[in-house]
């Protein structure tokens, strides 16, 4: 006697149109996916307001942006929220031009994952599969020691991970910590949390 298991993966998922299901996250095959997802609080808050300050000249605007601390752009916040553990979504293809923040978006997601794994006590490393150039860029944006600055006895770092790594190596916020110690501890955290592989390793 033989038994056959039929996978239901090929079946079209049921798309709920009744308003009583509005609290659910929409299915990715829902024809109104973009409208429904934009209505969720964590995504509606990441919309661009479209406001351009016409009172400032281009030079003044550039000066203001260069002197401000790093902030995730709305589209980067959207990506982070989309792939958080609060949603049912577990994959996303980021496709855009150069310099639009794809690497920083990926780092933000990876750091959320790393924090979650640490809370669970899981020591599994995050896998980054990319070409050598992309790996170098990822590592540089994750931690660039040239961006470490001492201000009033405290180290700060203006990058897409913000103060996250600094808080891990200095949870008690001690003043005047040795720079070399901070750099070595952050490098140790990254080496223990990330595994960088090229495409050839999968041949």
Pin down the residues of each PLM region.
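SF2 helicase/translocase NTPase motor core
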Residues: 2-79, 87-93, 100-203
